[in-house]
């Protein structure tokens, strides 16, 4: 028969045997042996331990950095201790049978090695600068960056085991260690931390202002546009290009320039032509011959096949046709218009018919001068690239040139004709001669063009001979 089973006595007998099998000899110094539980009140002083085979013997413990190799052989004898091998350590006095393995810092937790492992100290791991430790359990931790408190100020700086504590600005609330905008508040907890939102300007704006403001802007723009138009029509320096479009007038007269000759109301359509008796003529040096082939500038219609269009609001450009022209000749009052001396203020006086007949060219030449074909011959004889130079030399201003170009649009030939006609109207009658045009063309080295104009006029008279009036 076996031993009687007594529940109260079985556990103390079985437990030491189980513990002896579970705990190996290498960890006997770390985990107390079951027999030590009964011998805690051992007479061994501090720094010594009971001999495992003889409880009456007290052996000295090994210093840190060493481990127990053999127990002391007897009382008063030294314990055999050995130094820990590399990669192992013991940090306290002990009677361990082997040293403990050194720990390693964990890179996945962003740990860094503060100090390496030595025989009497384990590896010391920590965090980098501006990081703190977030622990789980007693020893495990990971490193996290300290909060910089954006949208707030630092209340308590970052420490080894604690993140920065921030104080948020107005309009932000603290969530964890970050200041979050109150616009992102979606629960009642953050509503307690966020102040009441002030009403925006749009909510408090008067509804009448929304309607009145656009009206004020539109009225201001209209007023500015009207003032610009008035200034453009009033001041001379803005007139040249805008005067004829905005103000409805096409003729500009500058101060100091002769006024354009415009027929008075009720003027008889039949024109009385009066010529100066003393046209000016002076010898002119002839420059070298320069070819002036008009074919390079495009085909131009024959002067005799076209007539000048009426000038826009500027009065008649040319005299009437030869059939309606009355010359200053003696005759009965019912058939002709006699030229009589004008008032003293008049600058152009008609000469007696007998004296004019003695000094003026023949009637065909006069009619040719008064015919629009004469001006068209000059227009067709001068290259378009040199035309503005010609009218500038004749005394036409830049504003007048630009205005006539603007009025005639893309009709270059009609614009040139209008420039020449404007020069005729502004020039005294005794000076507006073909001889003057000839001198200007010679100064421009366009002698070939001058010959072409003479040929176009039929060769009845040379431009260098007796002056021929363009009136």
Curated annotation (Swiss-Prot):
Q: TNFR-Cys repeats span which residues?
A: 43-82, 83-125, 126-166, 167-195
Q: Which residues lie on this side of the membrane: Extracellular?
A: 30-210
Which Gene Ontology terms cover its molecular function?
tumor necrosis factor binding; tumor necrosis factor receptor activity
Q: Which SMART domains match?
A: DEATH (SM00005), TNFR (SM00208)
Q: Could you tell me which residue ranges are on the Cytoplasmic side of the membrane?
A: 234-471
Q: Where is this region: N-SMase activation domain (NSD)?
A: 340-360
Lipid bilayer topology: Single-pass type I membrane protein
Q: One GO CC annotation, please?
A: receptor complex
Q: Name one GO biological process term.
A: cytokine-mediated signaling pathway
The cysteines joined by S-S bonds are 44-58, 59-72, 62-81, 84-99, 102-117, 105-125, 127-143, 146-158, 149-166, 168-179, 182-194, 185-190
Mention any Pfam family matching this sequence. Answer: Death
Q: What is the residue range of the signal peptide feature?
A: 1-29
Q: Where is the Death domain?
A: 372-457
User: Transmembrane region positions?
Assistant: 211-233
Record key words, sorted:
Apoptosis, Cell membrane, Disulfide bond, Glycoprotein, Golgi apparatus, Membrane, Receptor, Repeat, Signal, Transmembrane, Transmembrane helix
Question: In which compartments does the protein localize?
Answer: Cell membrane; Golgi apparatus membrane
Q: Which residues are glycosylated?
A: 54, 145, 151
Purpose: Receptor for TNFSF2/TNF-alpha and homotrimeric TNFSF1/lymphotoxin-alpha. The adapter molecule FADD recruits caspase-8 to the activated receptor. The resulting death-inducing signaling complex (DISC) performs caspase-8 proteolytic activation which initiates the subsequent cascade of caspases (aspartate-specific cysteine proteases) mediating apoptosis.
Domain remarks = Both the cytoplasmic membrane-proximal region and the C-terminal region containing the death domain are involved in the interaction with TRPC4AP.
Q: Give the multimer and partner information.
A: Binding of TNF to the extracellular domain leads to homotrimerization. The aggregated death domains provide a novel molecular interface that interacts specifically with the death domain of TRADD. Various TRADD-interacting proteins such as TRAFS, RIPK1 and possibly FADD, are recruited to the complex by their association with TRADD. This complex activates at least two distinct signaling cascades, apoptosis and NF-kappa-B signaling. Interacts with BAG4, BABAM2, FEM1B, GRB2, SQSTM1 and TRPC4AP. Interacts directly with NOL3 (via CARD domain); inhibits TNF-signaling pathway.
Q: What is this protein called?
A: Tumor necrosis factor receptor superfamily member 1A
Q: Which gene encodes it?
A: TNFRSF1A
